[in-house]
């Protein structure tokens, strides 16, 4: 008779050294002695928090930026030198999408029924609750027009100064990368379906200039292209620069490598798509700049796309969760998978906590050795060694306690500073600072 599986441990080789009870965040980015947190929508209407982490055991909030627009959030932040960029993206994106569908649907139902449709009939077709219809109607009456990104002078971290707001389009900007010269922005733009890449010259941050665009074939509707996929399933999530290349996660379109040696003419030089059969979309694609195991490899990580209730979790049982991919990119024209790394539902007591998500979401977007610091929503932080890229091995983990009133953690993002200190944020309240000591 088999013994029962032991209860999963909440931590291995990782210790929490401090914590701040800050609102849930979409990103934590560390530069020097400061951590920059981009917050998810919250009751305080807080956009960005800057934390002094020069003493990791005694972190100190030095400034916060509140949003004047209650319909937007700024859940991403990056800093180069004294320049900080944060995104501006629509709250309740799903409701906004339904608002776009409402006029056409109402016309269709009116023609079919010979009368005005009821809220219940509209809700059934839109796939929302009847109680959501007033919010959909409100979103239709007041179209969102604050999508874009903001550039701040943070020379004085205690007093960030807004330099410029760059408007884009649609629901606005999601995740992005930047360096001293350019910002690599994932945003909706007129004439395209779903997010595309727009590269801006930010050397004069008071006047960013668009340099070029890149998109997946089929996204440019105004150019006569037609998508071969439903809705916005194929789109850019974001792209990370490495040398003269951008590594792009493209949702259900898989991953792409983009040559930007001519910044005004980005071109695709590599592609790999594992959808189907794997159901969760490609979130982040990152180059590993040094040979690993004698190969040039890159890492991709999925995002477990939706929070599910208990009934939906049961219906999906047996399907793969979002995971970490190791890809051989030695020949960009023939990208090959080497390995995947998954976390078992048995390895977290919160894996089936509902409503919620369990699978992968993100990793630390810089790799200095062979350790990959990954976030699993209800699985917390997972530290994975890829010294043998064909056999990734977990060497540490940390599962935080759930935020008050939440059934489980929803670990969202991670960064690691040059001292090896780990910074972890949740979609619910909580900012954990950790240290990893392998045994």
Kindly label every feature range from the protein language model.
Residues 1-439:
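Feature marking well-ordered beta-strand scaffolds used for ligand recognition
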């Amino acid at each position: 008779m088999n013994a029962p599986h032991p209860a999963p441990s909440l931590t291995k080789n990782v210790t929490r050294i401090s914590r701040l009870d800050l609102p849930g965040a979409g990103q934590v980015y560390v530069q020097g002695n400061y951590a920059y947190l981009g917050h998810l929508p919250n009751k305080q209407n807080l956009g960005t928090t800057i934390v002094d982490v020069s003493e990791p055991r005694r972190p100190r909030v030095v400034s916060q930026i509140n949003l004047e627009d209650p319909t937007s959030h700024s859940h991403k932040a990056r800093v180069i030198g004294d320049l900080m960029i944060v995104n501006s993206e629509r709250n309740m994106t799903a409701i906004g999408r339904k608002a776009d569908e409402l006029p056409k649907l109402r016309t269709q139902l009116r023609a079919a029924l010979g009368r005005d449709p009821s809220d219940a009939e509209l809700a059934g077709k839109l796939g929302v609750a009847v109680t959501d219809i007033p919010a959909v109607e409100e979103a239709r009456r007041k179209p969102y027009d604050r999508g874009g990104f903001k550039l701040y002078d943070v020379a004085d971290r205690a007093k960030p100064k807004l330099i410029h707001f760059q408007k884009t389009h649609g629901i606005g900007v999601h995740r992005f990368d930047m360096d001293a010269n350019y910002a690599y922005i994932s945003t909706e733009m007129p004439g395209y379906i779903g997010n595309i890449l727009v590269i801006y010259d930010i050397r004069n941050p008071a006047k960013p200039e668009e340099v070029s665009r890149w998109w997946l074939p089929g996204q440019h509707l105004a150019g006569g292209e037609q998508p071969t996929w439903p809705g916005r399933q194929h789109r850019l999530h974001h792209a990370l620069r490495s040398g003269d290349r951008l590594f792009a996660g493209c949702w259900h379109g898989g991953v792409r490598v983009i040559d930007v040696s001519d910044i005004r003419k980005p071109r695709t030089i590599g592609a790999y798509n594992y959808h189907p059969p794997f159901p969760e979309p490609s979130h982040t694609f990152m180059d590993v700049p040094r040979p690993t195991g004698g190969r040039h490899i890159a890492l991709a990580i999925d995002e477990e796309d939706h929070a599910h209730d208990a009934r939906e979790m049961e219906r999906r049982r047996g399907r793969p969760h979002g995971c970490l991919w190791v890809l051989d990119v030695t020949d960009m024209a023939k990208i090959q998978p080497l390995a995947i790394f998954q976390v078992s539902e048995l390895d977290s007591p919160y894996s089936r906590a509902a409503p919620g998500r369990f699978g992968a979401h993100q990793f630390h977007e810089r790799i200095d050795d062979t350790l990959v610091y990954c976030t699993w929503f209800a699985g917390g932080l997972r530290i994975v060694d890829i010294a043998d890229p064909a056999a990734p091995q977990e060497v540490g983990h940390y599962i935080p306690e759930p935020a008050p009133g939440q059934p489980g953690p929803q670990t969202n993002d991670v960064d690691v500073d040059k001292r090896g200190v780990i910074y972890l944020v949740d979609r619910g309240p909580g900012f954990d600072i950790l240290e990893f000591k392998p045994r």
